[in-house]
Amino acid sequence: GLSSIKSDYQHRVLIGGRKTGGHGVGKINELAAEVARDDADKIVDAIRTAKHFFESDAFLLIASAAGGTGSGSIPIMTKLIKERYGDKPVYNLIVLPFQHEEDTEERTIYNSAACLKSVNSVADAIILVDNQRYVRKDFSLKNNMAKINALIAEPFYNLLCAGEEKKSKYIGVRMLDAGDIIQTLVGWTVIGYGKSDVPLIRIPFAGSRNFRKKSVEIHRGLRAMDEA
């Protein structure tokens, strides 16, 4: 994911240089919280000077719940950004640990619990990503990571592009914009996502469905979402 972020100082802000030398906090999230407080102005300045800052509708902060730097700093930064820019909601995407991390690393569960409790009190919405749920046993670790990242990013692409499409042929009957998203994302949030391939050439009257069949399919889909 970081490969697409520019490497200049405005896009990659190093925090904790004085306390940790920029080498992380060794899973000690309390230290990460201190680092975030000390260097918060560096991050806020980078946000404020961003090219499209005034066009943005909301903030999305992403962190791992099990690590030290992310889990300790994200509640601090969320609170600070909300105080500075109260007119824009701040969302948190929290990545939950793999099962083997919980079994082998002592601080994993503690950091995750502390992180979730902290962000719940400051973020406008929290979206959880369960790494373990996406794991495929027949995939290598590298392929698993790539697949998980793709599954996370795909639904977010459409969500973040809401209201941005300008070509009429891509605009559907029902249009969502940033205001609709802001009104919807509140508290603990789940994003349902689905897609269907549509043939380029459709034969008239072939496989046509009446409204009863469509209604049955909709109810099946709703039931499947409830069970999930």
What role is predicted for each listed range?
Residues 1-228:
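Tubulin/FtsZ superfamily GTPase core signature
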